[in-house]
Amino acid sequence: MAKYVIGSAWPYVQTVPHLGNLIGSVLSADVYARYLRLRGHDVVFVSGSDMHGTPIEVEAIQLGVDPADYAAKMHNIVAELFKRWDISFDLYTHTHSDVHIKFVQDFFLKIYNNGYIFTREEEVPYCPRDRIYLPDRFIIGRCPYCGYERARGDQCENCGRLLDPKQLVEPRCAICGSKPEWRLTRHWYLDLRRLEDRIRRYVEENPHLPPNAKEMSLGMLKEGLKPRAITRDNRWGIPAPFPGAEGKTIYVWFEAVLGYISAVAELKGEEGLRRYWKSPDTKIVFFVGKDNIPFHVIILPALLLANGDGYALPTTTASTEYLLYEGDKFSKSRRWGIWIDEALQLMPPDYWRFVLVYMRPENRDTNFTWQAALEVINKVLNDDVGNYVNRVLTLIKNRMGGAVPPPGTPAKEDEDFVAKATDLFKKAERHYDAIELKDALHAVVEIAREGNRYLNARAPWDLLRRDRESANAVMYRAYWSLKMLAAGLTPVTPRSAEELWRMLGVRQPSWEEAYKPPEAGAPLGEVKPLFRKYTEEEVKNLLKRLEELRSQKAARRYPWEQALL
């Protein structure tokens, strides 16, 4: 039994996450954590709401509400939505907890005392009307690259370029629209140059990093790491603990990545930190979208090395490409995409989970379309998987006494089928181990496809009339393949898999159970269809329903009122 810390990127809670956010981090992490638990491993799966930083502060100011109240309300909503998506966190916390705040301040003080932090002055935008500095999203203007009129001070949403506020054309305060002035301020910097060689070794010698994470990180290292400011002049955030840093907060990206550690401390205490985060035997795995790679592969390891308190470096960062919606990026401002609260108003979570993992953007951007989703649900989930389950179990239930038949005397075709199903199950296992979740699910589905071909070829309904021994042999092995199917589906569609285990009469599901020959005579549970189809007309009605829901949301002022629960 191995030890694992699994972490999914902490979502900003200025709004509800969308489907791209979900598959890029939280859902993928949940699938992997569920798989590891099914294998019997010791798993701690943590994440939480990123409650600080400029997105929340800007939105709160514009709405005239307190950022702490805003963030707390949205945290509760997002936490509840993740429960409804069956995300199996051991702890879903937030970055404004007492544990996290104290941990971050103590952690950075240690880095400061170790000599890896220095100060320097720089010019930053300041709004004289609102009397605040304008970091990151507090300032907007025209992008110098693509001309987008509402580019932010840290990045252009339209073309994706990283920006500095001084690059913006006609910059203005995001709150009041005033032209900013430039003022000198002092900030505290992490000296990444002193850590560069050790980070390079970590990246180059890490066999577990996926190609996109390794390539992006090596590209940054080739350009040379520069000192990064770890403080901001925000009012909302964790107060910087350094001498002379009164009125400063820790930059949100630098404190949020420490949440993976503070969450384990909150859940397991100091002993838990030693057991999971300070043990060389622990495998630490993060799940993020590709835009979060630098902070997990470069920044967090740098912080751990600079702290010097014996924390293990992450084993890998499983990073996806982007999920597009009908050919374009998800966009809140353009209402383009589907958000996780909306999705659950349209279909049950297992349908969404299956579709998203089946289409997971592992190696390249993937385009979610309703036509493709409908095909996955109807042809793959229902026809291939659900139909095979129903064919096997209804035949055993209705014509073989409702119990697992004896193994009979197998023909070569029967032995070949078990060998094929087992090979596919082992293939799924290898892909799950390698965090190739889409390929794992495809291998699981192939078990059902092989099963349908096997039933068609052997026709056990005919064998029952003339050769009971052969019929027993066929259905015994078909039942066995359903145990493999149930185990393979458990991480992806937990509710449906639980129902399948129940129908199979298996009381203690595990991955290893799938390898065990069935117990002849064991009774089945009540058999009923696992999945259903959706017609094109139903999808049209779902999209109509989506527009109605959005009209209701648009009429509500506050984001926590707009969320659909």
Curated annotation (Swiss-Prot):
Its cofactor is Zn(2+). InterPro entries: Anticodon_Met (IPR041872), Met-tRNA_ligase_1 (IPR023458), Met-tRNA_synth (IPR014758), Methionyl/Leucyl_tRNA_Synth (IPR015413), MetRS_core (IPR033911), MetRS_Zn (IPR029038), Rossmann-like_a/b/a_fold (IPR014729), tRNAsynth_Ia_anticodon-bd (IPR009080). One of its GO terms (cellular component) is aminoacyl-tRNA synthetase multienzyme complex. The keyword Magnesium does not apply. Zn(2+) binds at residues 143, 146, 156, 159. Its EC number is 6.1.1.10. It is an enzyme of class 6 (ligase). A motif ('KMSKS' region) lies at residues 329-333. ATP binds at residue 332. Pfam families: Anticodon_3 (PF19303), tRNA-synt_1g (PF09334). It comes from the Archaea. Keywords: Aminoacyl-tRNA synthetase, ATP-binding, Cytoplasm, Ligase, Metal-binding, Nucleotide-binding, Protein biosynthesis, Zinc. One of its GO terms (molecular function) is ATP binding. Belongs to the class-I aminoacyl-tRNA synthetase family. MetG type 1 subfamily. This is Methionine--tRNA ligase.
